[in-house]
Structure formats: structure tokens, C-alpha cells
């Protein structure tokens, strides 16, 4: 006999899954969990950029300005801008010995 005759070819009924050891409820729950996991993973990949950018930038908003007079708001904006402009065009040289 050759090796090719020893290989079994699956027939249509051979591909069916028969889980006699476990209950049907457990198999159904596992199947539903797997399908939900796949659906959530696909949505995560599709909307990754949109959702995570919105989440990341939403957390980086400035402090609340409710109840603060406009003059103080303007002063705060000027301080923030001056902090940004302090080092324009200046570089720090660090020499290692």
C-alpha cells in the first residue's frame, strides 16, 4: 500500500462538530462569546483612529473657565503664550565630560 491510500478524505458528515462531553448550553455560550469578541475586535480596528483620537484629545482640554472674569482669562492666556515664546530660537548645549 502507498501512503496516499492511507490518508482519509473527509466527507460532508465528517466536518460536523459533535461535542458529546459537554452540555449544549456551554457550547452555545462559547460560540456567542467568540462571535461577540470577533465583532468587537473588527469595530476596534475600524474605528481605532476616530475613537482614540477623540478620547485622547478630550482629556487634554484646558482648565474650566466658568465663573472667572474675562480679564483673568486673558491674563492666563498671555501667561501661557509667554511661557511658550520664552525659548524661541534658543538651544541649550549640554556637554558631557
Swiss-Prot record:
The chain crosses the membrane at residues 23-43. Keywords: Disulfide bond, Glycoprotein, Host cell membrane, Host membrane, Host-virus interaction, Hydrogen ion transport, Inhibition of host autophagy by virus, Ion channel, Ion transport, Lipoprotein, Membrane, Palmitate, Phosphoprotein, Signal-anchor, Transmembrane, Transmembrane helix, Transport, Viral ion channel, Virion. One of its GO terms (cellular component) is virion membrane. A lipid is attached at residue 50 (S-palmitoyl cysteine). It comes from the Viruses. Pfam families: Flu_M2. This is Matrix protein 2.
Amino acid at each position: 500500500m502507498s501512503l496516499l491510500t492511507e490518508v482519509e478524505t473527509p466527507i460532508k458528515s465528517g466536518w460536523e462538530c459533535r461535542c458529546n462531553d459537554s452540555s449544549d448550553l456551554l457550547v452555545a455560550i462559547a460560540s456567542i462569546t467568540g462571535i461577540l469578541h470577533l465583532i468587537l475586535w473588527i469595530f476596534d480596528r475600524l474605528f481605532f483612529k476616530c475613537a482614540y483620537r477623540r478620547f485622547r484629545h478630550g482629556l487634554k482640554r484646558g482648565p474650566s473657565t466658568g465663573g472667572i472674569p474675562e480679564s483673568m482669562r486673558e491674563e492666563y492666556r498671555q501667561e501661557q503664550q509667554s511661557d511658550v515664546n520664552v525659548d524661541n530660537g534658543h538651544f541649550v548645549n549640554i556637554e558631557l565630560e
